Design a protein with these regions (language model features):
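Class I S-adenosyl-L-methionine
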Residues: 1-19, 24-102
Length: 102
């Protein structure tokens, strides 16, 4: 039997774009979670993470880029969503809390 306590997934909004407008609760959650997951563009940009970095020191955190396909093909979408879910689940199963930034 697996005795590892599962991590918790936290959905965290970084607000409208200005780090100074992030809520205190969002900042506190990001500070406390060892893993930060955020959508990443095909060009490699992680806007939600960039905004969070303006309010929180993320050094020492595990950064988990999530790739969500921009496609109308439902199979492509399902595959990209499953890959993102699997990546997050691996950390949760290892007992690490994850903040999903958006």
């Amino acid at each position: 039997m697996d005795n590892v306590k599962k991590g918790t997934l936290h959905g965290v909004s970084v607000g409208p774009g200005d780090p100074e407008l992030m809520t205190l609760k969002a900042v506190r959650c990001i500070e406390q979670c060892p893993v930060l997951a955020a959508p990443q563009t095909a060009a490699g940009r992680m806007l939600a993470l960039d905004i969070a970095k303006g309010a929180v020191d993320v050094s020492g955190k595990i950064i988990l880029p999530l790739h969500f396909a921009m496609s109308r093909d439902s199979e492509v979408l399902k595959a990209s969503h499953a890959a993102a879910a699997d990546a997050v689940r691996a950390h949760l199963d290892a007992g690490r809390d994850v903040a999903l930034l958006n």
